[in-house]
Swiss-Prot record:
Its main location: cytoplasm. This is ADP-ribosylation factor-like protein 14. GTPase that recruits MYO1E to MHC class II-containing vesicles via the effector protein ARL14EP and hence controls the movement of these vesicles along the actin cytoskeleton in dendritic cells. It is found in: Cytoplasmic vesicle. Keywords: Cytoplasmic vesicle, GTP-binding, Lipoprotein, Myristate, Nucleotide-binding. Interacts with ARL14EP. The keyword Membrane does not apply. Pfam families: Arf. Gene3D superfamilies: P-loop containing nucleotide triphosphate hydrolases.
Length: 192
């Protein structure tokens, strides 16, 4: 993976929340990014936390929170320190599951702790027949409307092959840099 790099002690850190329904591919995606290979995963009960060093000298602490229905009720608890949200959608699923995913996405965006944080939706499983495109997900999830107050991007990807992951994380790091500059500027004005 092109974004991975050796540890740099002077790198900046960012806390990223990785959410999506169960079986959307969150853990597969995270371990593909971290180890540049596909690892066998099991359903996440609770959460996984991994630190991923990017070439941009930014270290991401990625919180991969389980997507089972019972776990979704505690997603809000993980938002407090999040500086970015990556939401994974299984684009090959049926209408009911996609609608459930859309509802959960809409709900999590209402959390006060992440009201302006950047969002990247990873439109996963593009390798499967009939998978919805990034444009389809943008429309179905009403991303333009729901994310009008923040930077957002919808990236088609395949967690198994790694296709599109570099681009999605690169976009997120661009957003994070911009988000930090904005927050630092606001902090300066608040001090005056």
């Amino acid at each position: 993976m092109g974004l991975l790099n050796s540890k740099n002690p002077q790198s900046k850190q960012a806390h990223i929340l990785l959410l999506g329904l169960d079986s959307a591919g969150k853990s597969t995606l995270l371990y593909r990014l971290k180890f540049a290979e596909t690892l066998a995963t099991i359903p996440t009960i609770g959460f996984n936390v991994e630190m991923v060093q990017l070439q941009s000298s930014l270290t991401l602490t990625v919180w991969d929170v389980g997507g089972q229905e019972k776990m979704r009720t505690v997603w809000d608890c993980y938002c407090e320190n999040a500086q970015g949200l990556m939401y994974v959608v299984d684009c090959s699923e049926g209408k009911k599951r996609l609608e459930d995913s859309r509802k959960e996405f809409k709900h999590i965006l209402k959390n006060e702790h992440i009201k302006n944080t950047p969002v990247v939706i990873l439109a996963n499983k593009q390798d499967l027949p009939g998978a919805l495109s990034a444009e389809d997900i943008t429309r179905m999830f009403k991303v333009k409307k729901l994310c009008s107050n923040r930077n957002w991007y919808v990236q088609p990807c395949c967690a198994v092959t790694g296709e599109g992951l570099d681009d999605g994380f690169r976009k997120l790091t661009e957003f994070l840099k911009s988000y930090r500059r904005t927050r630092e500027t606001l902090a300066i004005f608040k001090q005056k």
